[in-house]
Amino acid sequence: MTALANIRNFSIIAHIDHGKSTLADRFIQMCGALQDREMQAQVLDSMDIERERGITIKAQSVTLYYDHPNGERYQLNFIDTPGHVDFSYEVSRSLAACEGALLVVDAAQGVEAQSVANCYTAVDQGLEVMAVLNKIDLPQVEPERVIQEIEDIIGIDAVDAPRVSAKSGLGVDKLLEALVEFIPAPTGDRDAPLQALIIDSWFDNYLGVVSLVRVRQGTIKKGDKLYIKSTKDAHLVGSIGVFTPKPLDTGILEAGEVGFIIAGIKDIAGAPVGDTITHASTPDVDRIPGFKQITPQVYAGMFPVESTDFEKFREALQKLQINDASLFFEPDTSDALGFGFRCGFLGMLHMEIIQERLEREYDLDLITTAPSVIYEIVKKDGSIIYVDNPSRLPEPNNIEEFREPIARCQILVPQDYLGNVMTLCIERRGVQVDMRFMGRQVQLIFDIPMGEVVMDFFDRLKSVSRGFASLDYNFERYQVDKLVKVDVLINGDKVDALAMIVHETQSRYRGNALVTKMKELIPRQMFDVAIQAAIGSQIIGRSTVKAMRKDVLAKCYGGDVSRKKKLLSKQKAGKKRMKQVGNVEIPQEAFLAVLQVD
């Protein structure tokens, strides 16, 4: 049992690639939580995708025991959080369990937009934020400039910020000492009725639902009967403990501590994230104010290639949803693709990762349609509807006003690339709101249509600024504009999954570019294939895929039968990823061609 005064709960927040996960590895190593032979890079990034891409997607918690030079032993509960803008909701959830946060800034690159956004989130939640300069052993570091930037842009005192190298471990011991002094101990009465917050939940095939909780007051023991406020269900605690980073069963969690609970909950919705847990004997305890519900920004249709996989796909989405509260889905049908789901995501990276996890972890073959944002439509009769799928748009003569979502974008960019970035924002129909010079960096604030931001704006921003610009955005408002729906017809049949909503001024260009792109992607058939783009009944672009006869065995002559079988099976595998539309086969790439039309 650790006294409250000796517990420290904190998160690590930073921009992508500023060294959060590496610093977490050093903490684990220095506190002796893992043997040297068990150490590996990114210990806390448990998903294969996280390791391959070198990013953190899920926040992970670890309990470490640190022996301070003053002779005291401290329990450090720390949570490693994601840095990418798509996963900022994970950060706000983690911060709800902490009293303090370490803001890790790369001493060579300086402050970036996501650090600013996450830092403001921490300050809003009443946390103490401590700046840390990382990568101090690089030859190109400029600590004085970066300290000035932290003070100018974020507004926290950074003169005494610890300087560390998470890679080599330099200065990390001093950081641990400073952290214990700086971050306040938690408060809470261990004898009061139980009140605990669910920070995260995930599904384990053997144990059921595993919940990560922060105990605000009271004590949870093995065998206790717990009451979950929102579902009003009671469950018996089977196992309780902390991650060190391996699960360690301690049998008890007390006020101020962060740990896991397994209570044999089999229903996926049985332990919602952000909910409050108490004892079944005291069900009237107040709910802890949770986190704000996040709303998806991007919607896309996902359809199984094999229609028999539909139920398997539904189960996979339900299991992912418990672990990822921001994933939204509802059943959807498409004339071209059959039955599937309309899914909502926080951004393009989030969408890619969900698709990759579905294909890897649940062995599904999926076709994804081009993503779209939510539009607000005022109909002629005055009613307002929200449309996230171009194919569900009312007829043009029934629309009074077409409103698109606008994102408030905060961009930090070195002065050298300011011109390029402003040109890009204006190309994307952006309107400048503010511009501030802060040392070598410039803070730009633009209002840009959300549809332009979520597609490939982030990638383009990185390329025009050679990777130096950084972006944070959030939804600002709906605004009236001249938007039209462009349909794609293949041999005269509309393909609902290829429809897109674009600005009137770009409609002809985008329609023609899409038709040309589709011509490259649709394989030649036994007959001519006409591809047309249309607004209403007016055709704005056309191209034709010429007919051919495709014979994969033509070059085999006599040959061995196994060689012929190999060629035929290769052709069959290619066809599996295609769907019949009328009488034309369309590959997956064609459904995403909408994205590549620039």
Curated annotation (Swiss-Prot):
Biological process annotations from GO: positive regulation of translation
Positions bound to GTP: 17-22, 134-137
Record keywords, A-Z: Cell inner membrane, Cell membrane, GTP-binding, Hydrolase, Membrane, Nucleotide-binding, Protein biosynthesis
Name of the molecule in the record: Elongation factor 4
Task of the protein: Required for accurate and efficient protein synthesis under certain stress conditions. May act as a fidelity factor of the translation reaction, by catalyzing a one-codon backward translocation of tRNAs on improperly translocated ribosomes. Back-translocation proceeds from a post-translocation (POST) complex to a pre-translocation (PRE) complex, thus giving elongation factor G a second chance to translocate the tRNAs correctly. Binds to ribosomes in a GTP-dependent manner.
Entries under PANTHER family matching the protein: TRANSLATION FACTOR GUF1 HOMOLOG, CHLOROPLASTIC (PTHR43512:SF4), TRANSLATION FACTOR GUF1-RELATED (PTHR43512)
Keyword Nucleotide-binding found: yes
Enzyme class: hydrolase
Domain tr-type G residues, every copy: 5-187
CDD domains xref list: EF4_II, EF4_III, LepA, lepA_C
Family named by the database record: Belongs to the TRAFAC class translation factor GTPase superfamily. Classic translation factor GTPase family. LepA subfamily.
EC number: 3.6.5.n1
Catalyzed chemical reaction(s): GTP + H2O = GDP + phosphate + H(+)
GO molecular function, one term: translation elongation factor activity
Matches recorded under SUPFAM superfamilies: EF-G C-terminal domain-like, P-loop containing nucleoside triphosphate hydrolases
Coiled-coil annotated residue ranges, if any: none
KW Protease (keyword) present: no
UniProt xrefs under NCBIfam families: lepA, small_GTP
InterPro entries, sorted: EF-4, EFG_III/V, EFG_V-like, EFTu-like_2, G_TR_CS, LepA_C_sf, LepA_CTD, LepA_IV
Subcellular location: Cell inner membrane
GO cellular component, one term: plasma membrane
Bilayer topology annotation: Peripheral membrane protein
Taxonomic source organism: Psychrobacter cryohalolentis (strain ATCC BAA-1226 / DSM 17306 / VKM B-2378 / K5)
